[in-house]
């Protein structure tokens, strides 16, 4: 028997969608958690996002002649559109953790993994909205493909975008350069940007990594066992955490962007 390994869940007006990574299907439920149907696709789905009443899919290489990075489907699994075809000459270094979707209220941005061009949808048309420029550290996408390189090698000379997050009027991007994780914060109103590190002022030495962005709130979390083991002083200093057990739910940190 194969048990579902749900790696993502998303929702829209039509219900809740769970991505079963191992069996490569999307389980559709209504808001009473009544099962509706399984959605199957002829390609390998690794990330999903709901846009209004539709589902955006990000896929891995499938080796077929028709191989696109993104697909737009309706809630029944019918493909409505395809975006950004893959080059068959791409290398194999493609599966490294990074997100490809970010959404906040009515704003939606997507980008192929490690790509410096960020897109949005106008109706169902993919439209470039931002291009990242790391100056002399920008990967030369027009001359070669990043999947032919080991970007985790310390000798890799370029900066590679990892995750993207929309937070009200800000676009937050993280990248790794010479084994150090950096953040790039762009104010979409003033068009000003800042580069550097972001520290977690709630727990000293705890890494900062947004998990969810909603309105002007940036949400991070840590599992209870790790908090107890690695940051016992936090548990001792906060009365609300005194009865914390290793099996308890994760602890959330909620930040308000200024």
Which sequence ranges carry the predicted segments?
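Beta-rich catalytic cores
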Residues: 4, 43-44, 66, 95-97, ...
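Short beta-strand elements that form the blades of beta-propeller/WD-repeat-like
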Residues: 10, 14-20, 53-64, 99-120, ...
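Structural motif
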Residues: 23-27, 64-72, 114-121, 177-185, ...
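Short loop/turn segments that connect beta-strands within beta-propeller blades
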Residues: 29-34, 73-77, 121-125, 186-191, ...
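Loop-centered beta-sheet repeat module
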Residues: 67-122
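Conserved blade-ending motifs and adjacent loop-strand segments that build the rim/top face
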Residues: 89, 129-159, 188-216, 222, ...
């Amino acid at each position: 028997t194969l048990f579902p390994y749900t790696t993502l869940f998303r929702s829209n007006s039509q219900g809740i969608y769970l991505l079963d990574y191992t069996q490569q299907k999307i389980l559709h439920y209504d808001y009473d958690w009544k099962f509706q149907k399984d959605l199957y696709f002829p390609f390998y789905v690794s990330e999903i996002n709901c846009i209004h009443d539709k589902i955006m899919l990000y896929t891995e290489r499938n080796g077929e002649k028709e191989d696109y990075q993104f697909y737009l489907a309706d809630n029944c699994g019918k493909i409505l559109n395809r975006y950004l075809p893959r080059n068959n000459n791409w290398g194999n270094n493609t599966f490294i953790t990074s997100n490809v979707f970010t959404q906040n209220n009515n704003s939606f941005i997507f980008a192929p993994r490690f790509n410096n061009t960020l897109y949005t949808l106008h109706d169902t048309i993919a439209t470039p909205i931002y291009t990242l420029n790391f100056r002399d550290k920008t990967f030369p996408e027009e001359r070669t493909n990043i999947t032919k390189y080991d970007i985790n090698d310390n000798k890799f000379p370029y900066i590679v975008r990892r995750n993207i997050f929309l937070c009200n009027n800000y676009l937050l991007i993280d990248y790794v350069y010479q084994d150090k994780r950096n953040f790039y914060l762009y104010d979409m109103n003033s068009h000003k940007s800042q580069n550097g590190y972001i520290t977690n002022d709630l727990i000293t030495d705890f890494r900062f990594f947004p998990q969810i962005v909603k309105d002007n709130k940036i949400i991070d979390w840590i599992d209870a066992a790790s908090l107890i083991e690695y940051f016992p002083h936090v548990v001792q200093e906060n009365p609300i955490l005194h009865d914390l057990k290793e099996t308890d739910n994760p602890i959330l940190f909620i930040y308000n962007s200024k």
